[in-house]
């Protein structure tokens, strides 16, 4: 009988807290929300994304210093490309006439 009552307690807890948060979980969630609401918008406001497009003749193009590749494009209807060292786009088709890259960096305003 004692074993049965010990099994009943966790089940009762699940029934009480099943769909909604328990009071302690709700209090913790509210506190986390309160703290992050005041911190995150302030941090996000001062961080910006600076992006630019660069092109070059041939099969390689490199982003300016401090920028990283976010996408590549190739001439001659070539759709095969790869990113090298996070800063250079390489078009893999033979006889490339041009290669382009979209380069971005985070900056603090």
Curated annotation (Swiss-Prot):
The keyword Disulfide bond applies. Gene3D superfamilies: Resistin head domain. Keywords: Diabetes mellitus, Disulfide bond, Hormone, Obesity, Secreted, Signal. Its main location: secreted. Disulfide bonds join 51-104, 63-103, 72-89, 74-91, 78-93. SUPFAM superfamilies: Resistin. GO terms for biological process: positive regulation of lipid catabolic process. GO terms for cellular component: extracellular space. It is found in: Secreted. The keyword Membrane does not apply. Homodimer; disulfide-linked. Hormone that seems to suppress insulin ability to stimulate glucose uptake into adipose cells. Potentially links obesity to diabetes. This is Resistin. It comes from Bos taurus (Bovine). The gene is RETN.
């Amino acid at each position: 009988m004692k074993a049965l009552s010990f099994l009943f307690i966790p089940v009762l807890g699940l029934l009480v807290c099943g769909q909604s948060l328990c009071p302690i979980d709700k209090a913790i969630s509210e506190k986390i929300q309160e703290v992050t609401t005041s911190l995150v918008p302030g941090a996000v406001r001062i961080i910006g994304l600076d992006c630019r497009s660069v092109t070059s003749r041939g099969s390689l193009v490199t982003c300016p210093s401090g920028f990283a590749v976010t996408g590549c494009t190739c001439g001659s209807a070539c759709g095969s490309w790869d990113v090298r060292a996070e800063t250079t786009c390489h078009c893999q088709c033979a006889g490339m006439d041009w290669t382009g890259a979209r380069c971005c960096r985070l900056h603090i305003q």
